[in-house]
Amino acid sequence: MSVPLILTILAGAATFIGAFLGVLGQKPSNRLLAFSLGFAAGIMLLISLMEMLPAALAAEGMSPVLGYGMFIFGLLGYFGLDRMLPHAHPQDLMQKSVQLLPKSIKRTAILLTLGISLHNFPEGIATFVTASSNLELGFGIALAVALHNIPEGLAVAGPVYAATGSKRTAILWAGISGLAEILGGVLAWLILGSMISPVVMAAIMAAVAGIMVALSVDELMPLAKEIDPNNNPSYGVLCGMSVMGFSLVLLQTAGIG
């Protein structure tokens, strides 16, 4: 099994961590969840804008028009898909002050699971494609996606457990969204393999960079602010950028990057 596929599977499996936290009642503080989302956004923004997009533009045979065009395509494509999908957000189910009937919780959890699954599928493709092109960047994206997936698993499993009383059902429902990400990676592995040209890979990387920027700005940072409105998610973003930038410098200095 390829390393990029393993990274994608591990990132998707992080959803189960959140699911177990949801059914065990060991809910992390809102401050920690918000910081982790900001941290993930910082990692994605730095990798996308400082590594992936420049690498795609520098690829042999890649034109600036195609490179920037694919970046904008990924950016706008994410926003378009995000607007079309059923929209129930994790924070809607994580607020203890909201009292919902079991039927209402079930319905909201179904919509949330569906929406998250559809969002996670392209994230799996993005993780695999990035790791296939540059393993160093793949580790960073996998870490960011994993941090993003933990609150999602928590948000689905907690309400389902409250509605059904079944820990197994709650973990299963939460796991579906993580499996969607893994399926995305498997699909990319089966279709792309090693038979893809450098220009096509660079174009895909540029589009993935656009998707990651849109995800960070439109989903992760606003979600962090809603989960913990008393603190600025920018601290997590800056910390994520700093840690990722420092780690990239260390890897490149060691000759790994």
Curated annotation (Swiss-Prot):
Molecular function via GO: metal ion binding; zinc ion transmembrane transporter activity
Localisation: Cell inner membrane
Swiss-Prot/TrEMBL keywords: Cell inner membrane, Cell membrane, Ion transport, Iron, Membrane, Metal-binding, Transmembrane, Transmembrane helix, Transport, Zinc, Zinc transport
GO cellular component: plasma membrane
Pfam families: Zip
Membrane topology: Multi-pass membrane protein
List of residues binding Fe(2+): 120, 123, 149, 152, 181
Record carries keyword Cell inner membrane: yes
Catalytic reaction annotation: Zn(2+)(in) = Zn(2+)(out)
Disulphide bonds in the chain: none
Residues that hold Zn(2+) according to the record: 123, 148, 152
Transmembrane regions listed in the UniProt entry: 5-25, 32-52, 61-81, 109-129, 137-157, 171-191, 195-215, 236-256
PANTHER family found in the cross-reference section: ZINC TRANSPORTER ZUPT, ZINC/IRON TRANSPORTER
Database matches in NCBIfam families: PRK04201.1
Primary role: Mediates zinc uptake. May also transport other divalent cations.
Family label: Belongs to the ZIP transporter (TC 2.A.5) family. ZupT subfamily.
Protein name, per record: Zinc transporter ZupT
Annotated gene: zupT
